[in-house]
């Protein structure tokens, strides 16, 4: 089974709409990266219904640690930096998108995170 994980910073106290927008940015950017490096995972994910899981971290440090580990594992990913026009400071790191990829590969990095 394939999935995509989106990790959101919970400490920024973004509104629901802002979090949804950041999650969408992370999802799309990670998907575009996956198309370049893992077309078979993208095809599998598309055929299985495009499962997504949204998780949370409580700091920029945690978000960057996840991003680092995702890169070490060689998974398609994205790191989202907000422009700061609304609720957060310019340049704030808000989210990481991971995959699509096989669930077991993603869970190696996300297994200790809680659902948003």
UniProtKB/Swiss-Prot annotation:
Gene Ontology BP term (one): translation
Hydrolase in keyword set: yes
Residues annotated as transmembrane: none
Signal peptide: none
Protein's job: The natural substrate for this enzyme may be peptidyl-tRNAs which drop off the ribosome during protein synthesis.
Protein EC: 3.1.1.29
Principal location listed in the UniProt entry: cytoplasm
UniProt-listed Pfam families: PTH2
InterPro entries xrefs: Pep_tRNA_hydro_II_dom_sf (IPR023476), Pept_tRNA_hydro_arch (IPR034759), PTH2 (IPR002833)
Protein name: Peptidyl-tRNA hydrolase
HAMAP family: Pept_tRNA_hydro_arch
Domain of life assignment: Archaea
Chemical reaction(s) catalysed: an N-acyl-L-alpha-aminoacyl-tRNA + H2O = an N-acyl-L-amino acid + a tRNA + H(+)
GO molecular-function term, one example from the UniProt record: peptidyl-tRNA hydrolase activity
Compartment annotation: Cytoplasm
Family statement drawn from the similarity comment of this UniProt entry: Belongs to the PTH2 family.
Keyword annotations of the record: Cytoplasm, Hydrolase
A single Gene Ontology CC term: cytosol
């Amino acid at each position: 089974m394939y999935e995509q994980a989106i990790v959101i910073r919970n400490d920024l106290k973004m509104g629901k709409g802002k979090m949804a927008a950041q999650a969408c940015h992370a999802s799309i950017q990670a998907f575009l990266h996956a198309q370049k490096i893992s077309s078979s995972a993208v095809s599998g994910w598309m055929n299985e219904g495009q499962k997504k899981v949204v998780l949370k971290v409580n700091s920029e440090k945690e978000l960057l640690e996840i991003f680092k580990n995702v890169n070490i594992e060689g998974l398609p990913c994205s790191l989202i930096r907000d422009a700061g026009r609304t609720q957060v400071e310019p340049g704030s790191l808000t989210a990481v998108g991971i995959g699509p990829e096989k669930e077991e590969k993603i869970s190696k990095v996300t297994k200790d995170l809680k659902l948003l």
